[in-house]
A protein has these predicted regions:
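N-terminal Rossmann-like dinucleotide-binding module
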Residues: 4-29
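Rossmann-fold dinucleotide-binding core
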Residues: 16, 146, 150-216
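Short, surface-exposed basic-aromatic patches at helix termini and helix-loop junctions that form
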Residues: 24-27, 51-55, 76, 140, ...
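Glycine-rich phosphate-binding loop and adjoining beta1-alpha1-beta2 segment
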Residues: 24-60, 73
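Short acidic low-complexity segments
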Residues: 64-77
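An anion/phosphate-binding loop that grips the pyrophosphate of nucleotide cofactors and donors
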Residues: 80
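Rossmann-fold NAD(P)-binding glycine/threonine-rich loop
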Residues: 93-163
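Long, compositionally biased stretches enriched for glycine and/or charged residues
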Residues: 188-440
Length: 440
């Protein structure tokens, strides 16, 4: 009987999706499932909902156990075959709010702030110390487990685990799975969805759709470029930044336009405020999204707990398919975030890259991609520089390394002076209190 440990099980909606998928999978439906969180109330909510799915969808075959608090973490992990990570250190309040409000005082605006930008840097710096604790426990009580990381900032957290721990780690993101489908649907090319072939590689949230053909092998990019240019010229829509990537760089990118607007110095510029409207960029999008999600979940939770009629159908989420492939040996292809062991020739070896991977009984096996077009590798490098420096800061615990990471972050460096970057970092660290007290 496999054991699956879910770290951050208070993330009820995501835990429901991943673990509900496992209950719908023959190789996993009788698993022992350990639910771990530091929030007792949210943990109990997840346990109630997952227990209902187990009864209604799985005939009660899975064994669910809860573990609350750091003092019970080792037991939650003991003997695990798979560890799913979905923690958020500092929650929406106070930490996400701080990550947006303090930079605003310096004139630095953000959209999502969970992957790059000063918000992404701060999120990594308060999360990596927690992952260090996880890693020590995993190395002792479940050393053969696969660590499936879903927490952002993906490249920084997964890269840290891959470089500095003995834990078998892969980072997983939805954006690879939805990239070409969203592109073709947005351009009215739904007739090309079936049988399409694609190659995606780069870094998390900035991986590139390098090739896309129809079922007969015909290149779809010429028509994509024509339609994307026409749509950007004709109307406001939610994907204008990525369509501009197609125009200027020649390729489409995995993650959404609201994300990519803040990964470079090109779109959110205090000197050119008209660009916000021109590219339909939703500033402060993540806080709005969090508020709506919290409200929506409260309503959904009340309905679920009232009638208990919750069931589940297996989704396209990677996690259960990865576990199934490793346990059964039946191969499955994913886009995974792994250490760049010669996979992308013109990105550094220390980088965490997102490439096609084949999963089977031997584990997660990344595929060699070769060289990216120069302009795409250069765009990736602007992000990788900040990622690597942030990991270094998390290792050294030195504030001067945090300053360096922020100075290398493209959007931050384009908007602020060095002195203001240092002041902003100090103010953020102080505002985060105990979450970042280790940085001296």
């Amino acid at each position: 009987m496999p054991k699956i440990t879910f770290m951050g099980a208070g993330s009820t909606v995501f835990a429901r999706n991943v673990l509900g998928d496992c209950m719908c999978t023959p190789a996993l439906c009788e698993s022992e499932i350990a639910l771990y969180d530091i929030d007792a109330e949210r943990l109990e909510e997840s346990h109630l909902i997952l227990s209902a799915i187990n009864r209604n969808t799985n005939g009660g075959r899975a064994v669910l156990k809860t573990y609350c608090g750091a003092e019970n973490r080792r037991e939650a992990l003991r003997g695990a075959d798979f560890v799913v990570n979905a923690i958020q250190v500092g929650f929406y309040e106070p930490c996400t709010v701080i990550d947006f409000e303090v930079p605003k005082k310096y004139g630095l605006r953000q959209t999502i702030a969970d992957t790059l930008g000063i918000g992404g840097i701060m999120r990594a710096l308060r999360t990596i110390p927690v992952l260090e604790d996880f890693a020590r426990d995993i190395e002792e009580v479940c050393p053969d487990a696969w660590f499936l990381n879903y927490t952002n900032p993906m490249a920084m957290l997964s890269g840290y685990m891959q470089r500095y721990t003995g834990v078998k780690t892969v980072g997983l993101c939805h954006s690879v799975q939805t990239c070409s489908r969203d592109l073709l649907t947005g351009l009215g090319m739904e007739d090309q969805l079936e049988g399409r072939r694609e190659l995606i590689a780069g870094i998390n949230h900035m991986a590139w759709l390098l090739k896309i053909t129809d079922k007969d092998g015909r290149d779809l990019y010429p028509e994509i470029k024509r339609r994307a240019a026409e749509k950007n010229a004709a109307e406001k829509h939610k994907d204008m930044v990525r369509y501009e990537y197609i125009r200027r760089l020649g390729y489409y990118c995995t993650e959404s336009s609201e994300h990519n607007a803040e990964y470079n110095p090109l779109f959110i510029k205090s000197k050119y405020p008209e660009l916000i409207e021109a590219y339909n960029i939703p500033l402060d999008e993540y806080p709005r999204r969090c508020v709506n999600q919290i409200k929506g979940w409260k309503e959904e939770k009340a309905n679920i707990l009232q009638d208990g009629k919750i069931e589940h159908t297996r989704s396209a989420e990677y996690a259960s398919y990865i576990m199934e492939a490793i346990l059964t040996g039946v191969p499955y292809k994913i886009g995974g975030n792994v250490l760049n062991t010669g996979l992308i020739d013109n990105l550094p070896a220390d980088a965490c890259v997102e490439v096609p991977c084949l999963v089977d009984h031997m584990g997660i096996n990344p595929c060699h991609v070769g060289r990216l077009p120069v302009q795409l590798a250069a765009m990736n490098m602007t992000n990788i520089n900040a990622q690597l420096m942030t990991i270094e800061a998390a290792r050294t615990r030195k504030r001067e390394d945090i300053y360096r990471a922020a100075m290398l972050e493209p959007h931050t460096a384009a908007e602020l002076s060095i002195d203001d970057i240092v002041k902003m970092c100090d103010e953020l660290i102080e505002a985060h209190g105990d979450y970042m007290a280790m940085y001296k």
